[in-house]
Amino acid sequence: MSFYNHKEIEPKWQGYWAEHHTFKTGTDASKPKFYALDMFPYPSGAGLHVGHPEGYTATDILSRYKRAQGYNVLHPMGWDAFGLPAEQYAMDTGNDPAEFTAENIANFKRQINALGFSYDWDREVNTTDPNYYKWTQWIFTKLYEKGLAYEAEVPVNWVEELGTAIANEEVLPDGTSERGGYPVVRKPMRQWMLKITAYAERLLNDLDELDWSESIKDMQRNWIGKSTGANVTFKVKGTDKEFTVFTTRPDTLFGATFTVLAPEHELVDAITSTEQAEAVADYKHQASLKSDLARTDLAKEKTGVWTGAYAINPVNGKEIPIWIADYVLASYGTGAVMAVPAHDQRDWEFAKQFDLPIVEVLEGGNVEEAAYTEDGLHVNSDFLDGLNKEDAIAKIVACLEEKGCGQEKVTYRLRDWLFSRQRYWGEPIPIIHWEDGTSTAVPESELPLVLPVTKDIRPSGTGESPLANLTDWLEVTREDGVKGRRETNTMPQWAGSSWYYLRYIDPHNTEKLADEDLLKQWLPVDIYVGGAEHAVLHLLYARFWHKFLYDLGVVPTKEPFQKLFNQGMILGTSYRDHRGALVATDKVEKRDGSFFHVETGEELEQAPAKMSKSLKNVVNPDDVVEQYGADTLRVYEMFMGPLDASIAWSEEGLEGSRKFLDRVYRLIRSKEIVAENNGALDKVYNETVKAVTEQIDSLKFNTAIAQLMVFVNAANKEDKLYVDYAKGFIQLIAPFAPHLAEELWQTVAATGESISYVTWPTWDESKLVEDEIEIVVQIKGKVRAKLMVAKDLSREELQEIALADEKVKAEIDGKEIVKVISVPNKLVNIVVK
């Protein structure tokens, strides 16, 4: 057979690997370790798409490579299986979310196995398994004991259609929910919060120690949002009330001409005048209908209402009006801001909208035309006049502290983590609320608190989860007869994914989250590969939980993931009409190399776009594996371009990768393999071993494959192939195309055993040296010939070769040679007359 029969060979080796537990994690204590982690998937009903295997193939290449280098390799897979989609589907269809999830997992696992990934399935985890979420609940109880999990009445992003509150991060810029695109309104509710802010400084500082891209680190830094400034206290005129604002520019306090409170600020009702009461109440209601993102959108029209009250500016005693406006959030900072319209664009727009005074306190701009937001020397600022920013801040903070109306302060943009969901399909929060007003955590001996099975998973309608409907589960009685009620909120999907990488290390431990010695052996994760869309939330939450567990003495490292790599997106093919509107692929026909709308006949422009069901451009890996084989898909996705680039899917590229594998198959199966080395491939073979090794180490898989192609081209020009080079080449291609490599290994090694643990080939540096070099021959200073000669010839040998060259002989025919200058490895210069 002259081609790679993937339909026969791939299932054969997948069966072999499963039967022999080929990829069981090594436990030889004398070997170094390598922990390669994929971001585990949510098992959706749609199954895998071709974007999933890109990251999975990258970690699989590294895992196979490291096994061959003698490492114990931990390369696991599992399922992030709680979450809204399964529950929504269950409500829509009447199916049990657990059954639906189990079916989806089975499908995902089938698809993953068909791609030949070397996972240790003995370590599979599932966040919905009570044996797993027992430890998710255990971590929560520890957070609760340490005061890091607490209840608070907070305004939440309520989504009526989903029947739950969602985190700020799950609200889209247009004010709708990320899941489903439903309207989001603000509503005060009792919620569980995790005090991630207690770890803000460590989460920020420890980024410096990580091998992550600067862009991802910057996203986390910006999310944490550290600001150094001052808290300033303003008294409310004619009352004993006061409020505090945080500002990074206390030096501009002389320019504060009004203050703004969040509509939800606790002082608003107390200070609002009778005349303004109705307007304030109306405005508060309107603000409650908007999400935080919609409220803080810089582009939106400025709205607000005066409360009728005045604050006293603490540095000059001036009375300045107190307004409420929805761009100030009660959950951010102190829920109050001092407005300096001359030097802040949003304040300037607000002042212009409502005809409020604008006082310049930094020279350099025209504040009637626009806010001046650069630095300058202080003016109109009494004792700060003439000072620069740094000196003025130091002086004003000292003044405020002396007067008792302010102090230096560090704040963070980071908010505490809203940890409750009013849904059924999640981990039950292990807390009991007693009728005597106390609350306690479910003791460890009673964990897991198992999610009860029920068909009634519709929201309760009271703002509580469907668990509130299950009286038998809900109501409990203590030994002393005191009655209690279980917490009805469940945890968010982020919970199980915040520590799953730890459970892979010891997945069957019933006594503890994981054994300390095993955690010491395997942590930190050596490389974590996944999409950049998780750059902030998942990674920040996982780092928070890891640091908490470090403080408890559970884990031995400060950070979970030493190296992080974000693969690019695989884009689909899309088509746009003259308006730029996208056209679904089933409405497109190809004629003479161009693309046309089937219904209108309009010629369309082809362009890459994110794969989506609506555009009908999603590529199913099952179809690719059926037609081309798993190894083709793996090689193609790695050869498309740099791993971190977003690149459009191409059927032609897929066919090219398949042709390459057929050429590899023919090379090994058809070429005469011999025990004697004639040296013809010494240089290209050793170059290939060196290049592929170095490029796998640096995740440059596309250039590694390109070098494998160079070797195949060179080998095909020879009549025979040296057996050690054949073996070495098969080992080099094995991480990329493992099924093909296993099959070809049997051809040349005939051991009957897997290639997986055969020692990785090495290169001979001496074989990389060029044996021949090019020299130039000059006659009267002009280049007349270029010759390939053996390296390091003597002057005499160079001269002899140059003078014997036919082209040179023709040039000097009939002329007298005055002298010949030879420079070894460079040139021969012939002087004639």
UniProtKB/Swiss-Prot annotation:
Its EC number is 6.1.1.4. The keyword Cytoplasm applies. A motif ('KMSKS' region) lies at residues 610-614. Its main location: cytoplasm. Keywords: Aminoacyl-tRNA synthetase, ATP-binding, Cytoplasm, Ligase, Nucleotide-binding, Protein biosynthesis. It catalyses: tRNA(Leu) + L-leucine + ATP = L-leucyl-tRNA(Leu) + AMP + diphosphate. GO terms for biological process: leucyl-tRNA aminoacylation. CDD domains: Anticodon_Ia_Leu_BEm, LeuRS_core. A motif ('HIGH' region) lies at residues 41-52. One of its GO terms (molecular function) is ATP binding. GO terms for cellular component: cytosol. It is found in: Cytoplasm. PROSITE patterns: AA_TRNA_LIGASE_I. ATP binds at residue 613. InterPro entries: aa-tRNA-synth_I_CS, aa-tRNA-synth_Ia, Leu-tRNA-ligase, Leu_tRNA-synth_edit, M/V/L/I-tRNA-synth_anticd-bd, Methionyl/Leucyl_tRNA_Synth, Rossmann-like_a/b/a_fold, tRNAsynth_Ia_anticodon-bd. It is an enzyme of class 6 (ligase). SUPFAM superfamilies: Anticodon-binding domain of a subclass of class I aminoacyl-tRNA synthetases (SSF47323), Nucleotidylyl transferase (SSF52374), ValRS/IleRS/LeuRS editing domain (SSF50677). HAMAP family: Leu_tRNA_synth_B. NCBIfam families: leuS_bact. Belongs to the class-I aminoacyl-tRNA synthetase family. This is Leucine--tRNA ligase. It comes from Streptococcus pneumoniae (strain 70585). The gene is leuS.
